UniProtKB/Swiss-Prot annotation:
Originating species: Globodera rostochiensis
Protein name per the record: Glyceraldehyde-3-phosphate dehydrogenase 1
EC class (word): oxidoreductase
Pathway in which the depicted protein is active: Carbohydrate degradation; glycolysis; pyruvate from D-glyceraldehyde 3-phosphate: step 1/5
SUPFAM superfamilies hit by this protein: Glyceraldehyde-3-phosphate dehydrogenase-like, C-terminal domain, NAD(P)-binding Rossmann-fold domains
Gene: GPD-1
């Protein structure tokens, strides 16, 4: 099988973990990485050592300006490294990169991300929400993808990827009248280690390791983009908490059809073992956040944490590794 050739723009948290996933799953060939701020030797160090996910289970080195990744003694990826600020200048075609993962968090509109097409890329996947690019969430609306016209797409946010599969199952089975989502979210790179200035929301500048910080999120509203029948029915907020990784969604919803918690659990379990296997998970174990470190599933339903006030009003809980 010929593996799709992929380029990565931005070698931060998501870019590095995308490369780790590519090496582990062995379904795509990463042929190039661009990052204007990280030198080659530093890329080796940052990829090899990770405070959250641990040391890379393999070997990475440099050769003639390339990164060379080895797994089980075999070189699996030889990766050309660019250090360019303008994505239009990256010569993706020279290395055969047809697909680009846009993981800088900067080029998140169709216009900005389309710059990769000038260098020879054929498709661009933005690893963040986008104001105007078509948004696709696996298990929810990927069947709507049109390869003839969708050259730049968004894979939405980690939180939307957690919420949307769960919301789809509940809406399909019982109907959602309206709902409020809260994500209890681990710290991210945009936060401050100690109190500092922040231009938008002042409390976003408070020390991440010292505080629980209320924050805005568009993740719930974004579900309306991938599940049109829920458009305008969901909104939400976040609490940033001092943990390094793994977050959890709390969906409180009013249902059209009456449903017991057992019926809801059965519906989610059926989906998790059926058409959403590998995307939506289900557990009845007494789990905590670190139990999901490195879990590649988008959303893991915590049956034991869910509660119901009455058959029309429920609180549902689902975990996700917000980096992986």
């Amino acid at each position: 099988m010929v593996k799709p050739k992929v380029g990565i723009n931005g070698f931060g948290r998501i870019g590095r973990l995308a490369l780790r996933a590519a090496v582990e799953k062995d379904t795509v060939q990463v042929v190039a990485i661009n990052d204007p701020f990280i030198e080659l030797d530093y890329m080796v160090y940052m990829f090899n050592y990770d405070s959250t996910h641990g040391r890379f289970n393999g070997k990475i080195s440099t050769s003639a300006g390339n990164l060379v990744v080895e797994k089980e003694g075999k070189a699996t990826h030889t990766i050309k490294v660019f250090n360019l600020k303008d994505p239009a200048e990256i010569k993706w075609a020279e290395v055969g990169a047809e697909y680009v993962i846009e993981s800088t968090g900067v080029f998140t509109t169709i216009e900005k991300a389309s710059a990769h097409l000038k260098g020879g890329a054929k498709k661009v996947v933005i690893s963040a929400p986008s104001a105007d690019a078509p948004m696709y969430v696996m298990g929810v609306n990927e069947d709507k993808y049109d390869p003839a016209k969708d050259n730049v797409i968004s894979n939405a946010s980690c939180t939307t990827n957690c919420l949307a599969p769960l919301a789809k199952v509940i809406n399909d089975e019982f109907g959602i009248i309206e709902g409020l989502m809260t994500t209890v979210h681990a710290v991210t790179a945009t936060q401050k280690t100690v109190d500092g200035p922040n231009g938008k929301q002042w409390r976003d500048g408070r020390g991440a390791a010292q505080n629980i910080i209320p924050a805005s999120t568009g993740a719930a509203k974004a579900v309306g983009k991938v599940i049109p029948e829920l458009n305008g029915k969901l909104t939400g907020m976040a609490f940033r908490v001092p943990t390094p990784n793994v977050s959890v969604v709390d969906l409180t919803a009013r249902l059209e059809k009456p449903a017991s918690l057992d019926a809801i659990k059965a519906a989610v379990k059926k989906a998790a073992e059926g058409n959403l296997k590998g995307i939506l998970g289900y557990t009845e174990d007494q789990v905590v956040s670190t139990d999901f470190l490195g879990d590649s599933r988008s959303s893991i339903f915590d049956a034991g944490a869910c509660i119901s006030l009455n058959p029309h009003f429920v609180k549902l809980v689902s975990w996700y590794d917000n980096e992986f």
